[in-house]
């Protein structure tokens, strides 16, 4: 019997289930818990602990532990266990938890090569995070693996538990993320109408709110502590232990009106030598006030998802709550009341995602490379002198199915056919054999139901046919449509302007396959150090596409082929697939060199887009400054409440201290910057004409103050003529304006790039901005080469060094960052 496995790899807890097509089974931890804390603890002897033991010890000895690393998946943030001098990646940590959970399975399931495993990821996960999860599964030694979005898995769990038609909303609030899914069920078939969520919203944020707003103020009032308490490494263990105590108090408030955050001894003294302890009364009312903002954020996410689906609350029958924090009644009541939708607790909130993942795993064609879904249509060719075949629905969600006769030849008069169940002995009786004849069969059990077809001649004698066996799988539910959670595109340059060619748009049904053609923007010679870069971005910002989040770079390097040259303008044929999970697969062929480059090999790299959030405070500060300057410029001419919202997001982001090393705090700040960018993009879209005028005026002012003196007379005249052309484009609402503007900016850059002193200034800035470079060693080597070039007055070499620095720099989305653009063009 085949078994299918589902793993909910959670921020706080993980769970694993199996499904054999009929029955679900949850595998408990050795401690007999339904879920296993996603925690690793390594003692001073190097022994590893997982689960509850690891989580409890992590509170007392945080430098020996790794927790909540799921939030850092897809980034270059190291997970440091300083006490044992071990540094792990988030992928390595996740691999340990996957290996642990997979080990709960019986040996016959683990070692069966046919076992397929679905690992769930939040809908808000981007391509880098999904790739990191697949890497973790490979490290864990799990065989056949596919990813699935957590809200889809939750929907499958709901469908397994309760039949019935209608629209329902899944509110999946876990330890780290919020996922919202809206689904419609009709006769056992379910369509996802829309999904949304918040990447950094979960139980961990509730814990941190208690720590920041109750515990820290109490400590500062009670004891003599330094002003830099939050970032002072001396107090790291104390604060981690306090956070654990806050979390335990939060859990107790699910069943009590009042509790105490208590730690009799935190093994730390204050500046006056007094022993530090915790003894803080907290009420349910206190907690409600602290988490109100996050609950409001989750309610707004649900409303936005309803809007995406084109639905009102009146169209939705119930909210199904999933995830540990939804145990809290105040949260459930508040969400249901604000949305005016009835609350439901029909699934186990702690295990629903793992259960649904196992059910979904049964629907995957594990023999296919793309891990697509099994076909819902079945057919057999019985052959013979009748050219006989039978068509049927191979995977119905209900208890009945029809088998249809297809005749290609002439049938003998009086011929009949019959269908028997090999499971129950049921028989249909004989029915006249003719094209289009049908027999309805009963599916007696979930999973595979096997039938055999018999054919008889006019005298009742058996007629030999070829294939006569039909297997129909009665499924728990059938997913008709999975919408894409985001828009994903490839950046191209068009007349100097960056544009996105979309592979998939938000809410497009998945999976999606297609073919796109591009051209090389520059030549690439075999074995050279250069590359052609397909920059993959996620988002809907169209006028300034580099404001969209970069999620990876597919690079064809000169070292990837041994002979020939890809000439500028050469055709690049890109076959792509966006899978059910939202993962992107790219294969690029280059006819001119007969080359083929596939993303599942070494050519797809996440490194260019990853951030180390343990060392990102300077980068965040720079991003905040850039976006704030843009917002201030727009606010001088336009009054829009979204600008105030964007500034509020930036204020939150700018509160990160310059020496902040907590990855979660830094990542939340960067997410706030991304939200501010989206709000600004919305304002630009709604006020396109005045925004265009501002952009043109700014570009002209820059030319007049910084560039005109360096320009040749013909260049200045040409620039002025192009300005007039751009102005006419604004006045006539022409779509060519952005092309003209980018050409103007490009001319500014080209003139400045000729000036040696400008190149030196740019080099000095890049040499100092170490936080903008993931590969610090390569950055240092290039800086050394640049300094040597300056000493030798070799400015052409310096220009080459600056170009290389830009190519490995984390893109800030700055319009003046002209060297950071992709180098492929439209076909």
What kind of region is each of these model predictions?
Residues 1-75, 79, 87, 107-827:
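Oxyanion-binding/catalytic loops of NTP- or PPi-dependent enzymes
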Residues 87-96:
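Conserved AMP-binding/adenylate-forming core of the ANL superfamily
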Residues 98, 106-107:
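Non-catalytic, mostly N-terminal accessory regions of nucleic-acid modification and defense proteins
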